[in-house]
């Protein structure tokens, strides 16, 4: 536990991250994909036995795995990249990861456990967030499935998956639950401006729905650098009531945003809420040590409502 906290602290305080890189196809020049190691619980080979789901196994989800007594949904990552929310019943079997070894990355984020079927693990890469840029909004990323890109080596790039988008696609009923929850929250009376830093299109849509329902003014930025530039430009900080920031973002991380705001005498009083899918104790403790005013597991509507009501009152 202490080792995990030290590792997390070292990476975040230096504006760095580590990504597990993997491939979905056997070709030598196959595209590489990645995800933050802090969202990964373990990597396993399963025996191929999966509890099937109603409606068959021709969609994104293959069924359920039993991992250490826990039933976890198994997703074929290649199928998900070809999934279109406008055609949810499409047969995706032809897009499957073709592998007899049943290699699976078991993940935990946003209070969800999920198993991802991939073809091959490459290695972990260590990057500064300044070396990471936003993913192009074209091709398979038209629906926001890629949050960022970075270099694997001189010749190849890694596409970082937007796991928040994956969760919303795999569990569409969560959106219905969110819509019901939104009906239960009341508007907050405040003229203060809310600044949001979020690179995930899926997560940003949820946040925007929340603040719009609360009838609050806001501006959203795709990364922490743009938020900070705006905050200190023309003394905009005088109009701001609270900052909500993700942790994983191209250019600079949410922890860097938090550190900068709290270290500047002009903004040290400004409430900063961390909204992250990386909900480990080590991340929470680091946020608290850096004087974050709140930590929300992305994006808990009721918790965000309560924190905004408290900070804006």
From Swiss-Prot:
Disruption phenotype: Deletion mutant is fully chemotactic and forms swarms the same way as wild-type strain. Mutant shows however defects in mouse colonization.
PROSITE patterns: CHEW, RESPONSE_REGULATORY
The UniProt record lists the keyword DNA damage: no
The entry's keywords: Phosphoprotein
Pfam families named in the record: CheW, Response_reg
A single GO BP: chemotaxis
UniProt domain Response regulatory: residue ranges: 193-313
Residue ranges annotated for the CheW-like domain, each copy included: 16-172
InterPro entries reported in the protein's UniProt record: Chemotax_regulator_CheV, CheW-like_dom_sf, CheW-lke_dom, CheY-like_superfamily, Sig_transdc_resp-reg_receiver
Location of 4-aspartylphosphate modifications: 246
Post-translational changes noted in the entry: Phosphorylated; probably by transfer of CheAY phosphate group.
Role, per record: Plays a role in chemotaxis signal transduction system in order to colonize the host stomach. May act as a phosphate sink to control the flow of phosphate to CheAY.
Annotated protein name in UniProt: Chemotaxis protein CheV2
């Amino acid at each position: 536990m202490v080792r995990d906290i030290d590792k997390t602290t070292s990476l975040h305080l230096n504006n760095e991250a580590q990504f597990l890189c993997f491939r979905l196809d056997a070709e030598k020049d196959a595209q590489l994909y990645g995800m933050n190691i802090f969202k990964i619980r373990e990597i396993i080979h399963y025996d191929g036995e999966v509890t099937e789901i109603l409606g068959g196994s021709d969609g994104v989800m293959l069924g359920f795995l039993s991992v250490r007594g826990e039933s976890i949904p198994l997703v074929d990552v290649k199928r998900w990249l070809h999934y279109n929310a406008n055609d949810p019943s499409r047969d995706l079997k032809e897009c499957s990861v073709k592998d007899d070894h049943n290699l699976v990355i078991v993940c935990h984020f946003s209070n969800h456990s999920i198993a991802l079927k991939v073809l091959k693990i490459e290695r972990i890469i260590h990057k500064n967030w300044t070396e990471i840029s936003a993913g192009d909004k074209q091709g398979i990323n038209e629906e926001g499935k890629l949050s960022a890109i970075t270099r694997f080596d001189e010749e190849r790039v890694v596409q970082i998956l937007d796991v928040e988008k994956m969760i919303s696609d795999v569990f569409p009923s969560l959106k219905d639950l969110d819509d019901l929850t939104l009906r239960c929250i009341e508007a907050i009376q405040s003229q203060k401006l809310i600044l949001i830093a979020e690179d995930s299109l899926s997560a940003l849509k949820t946040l925007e729905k929340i603040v719009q329902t609360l009838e609050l003014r806001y501006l959203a930025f795709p990364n922490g650098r743009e938020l900070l530039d705006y905050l200190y430009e023309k003394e905009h900080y005088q109009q701001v009531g609270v900052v909500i920031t993700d942790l994983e973002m191209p250019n600079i991380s949410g922890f860097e945003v938090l550190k900068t705001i709290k270290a500047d005498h002009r903004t040290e009083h400004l409430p900063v809420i961390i909204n992250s899918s990386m909900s480990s104790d080590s991340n929470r403790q680091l946020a608290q040590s850096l004087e974050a005013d709140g930590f929300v597991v992305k994006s808990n509507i009721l918790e965000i409502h309560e924190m905004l009501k408290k900070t804006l009152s």
